[in-house]
């Protein structure tokens, strides 16, 4: 069960942040609202607030930030990039403007953290699960952002990554979700992909890569 943290942090824990889509950027925010308005109208439901998720993983004195973001979003040289993938269409990934990266960033920062809704949510405080989550980050599938190449019924994006990592590392997902009246597009894709592990489809790989592994997984841009 997720809980909001009181002052002071656990020695080990996985903290989930919900950031309003487009926090800090009007272009993304307004496009997100337009997308949600169209989607809600098609599905005959009220429009919801859209959220982007990120994680902070604490193990003793170490702190890692886990996030999917555009490759051009920060100039920090050592930001723990372990996976890269294309945005929109596979062949567009050859251009940096259409490429995302997955970060496992030691002592990293989450842009616009001050805009997170309801502060950090403690998903779990088990050190073994936290380590397992860190090991899984480089194994995230580098599929195309915004598309459903894995046939999960939902598009792949930052929320998919976070849901996949939490579920594959053994966290209880039954009470984990966006804030009230909110929606996290892509979240279901991560849960579906994680569930395939239980069905013997090996969607959560068993090989291990420690928190300091430097290998970056990339697709071949077609």
Each model region followed by its residue ranges:
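Short helix-capping/linker segments at secondary-structure and domain boundaries
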Residues: 62, 167-175
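Active-site nucleophilic cysteine motif
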Residues: 147-169
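Intrinsically disordered, low-structural-confidence terminal and linker regions
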Residues: 3, 219-221
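Charged/polar, solvent-exposed surface patches and flexible loops
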Residues: 131-139, 164, 185, 189
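Short terminal or interdomain "cap/linker" segment that borders an active site or interface and mediates
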Residues: 179-219
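Surface-exposed patches in mature extracellular/periplasmic domains of secreted proteins
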Residues: 145-149, 173-178
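Non-catalytic ligand/cofactor/substrate-binding and regulatory segments of enzyme domains
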Residues: 2-151
């Amino acid at each position: 069960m997720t809980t909001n943290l009181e002052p002071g942090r656990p020695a080990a824990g996985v903290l989930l942040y919900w950031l309003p889509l487009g926090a800090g950027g009007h272009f993304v925010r307004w496009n997100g609202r337009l997308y949600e308005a169209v989607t809600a109208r098609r599905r005959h439901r009220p429009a919801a607030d859209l959220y982007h998720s990120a994680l902070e993983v604490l193990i003793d004195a170490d702190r890692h930030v886990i996030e999917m973001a555009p490759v051009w979003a920060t100039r920090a040289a050592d930001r723990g990039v372990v996976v890269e993938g294309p945005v929109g269409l596979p062949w567009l990934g050859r251009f940096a403007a259409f490429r995302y990266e997955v970060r496992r960033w030691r002592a990293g920062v989450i842009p616009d953290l001050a805009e997170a809704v309801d502060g950090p949510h403690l998903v779990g405080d088990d050190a073994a699960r936290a380590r397992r989550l860190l090991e899984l980050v480089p194994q995230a599938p580098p599929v195309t952002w915004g598309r459903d190449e894995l046939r999960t019924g939902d598009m792949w994006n930052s929320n998919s990554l976070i849901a996949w990592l939490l579920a594959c590392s053994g966290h209880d997902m039954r009470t984990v979700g966006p804030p009230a009246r909110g929606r996290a597009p892509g979240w279901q894709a991560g849960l579906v992909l994680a569930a395939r592990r239980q069905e013997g489809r090996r969607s959560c790989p068993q090989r291990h890569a420690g928190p300091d592994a430097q290998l970056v997984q990339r697709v071949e841009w077609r």
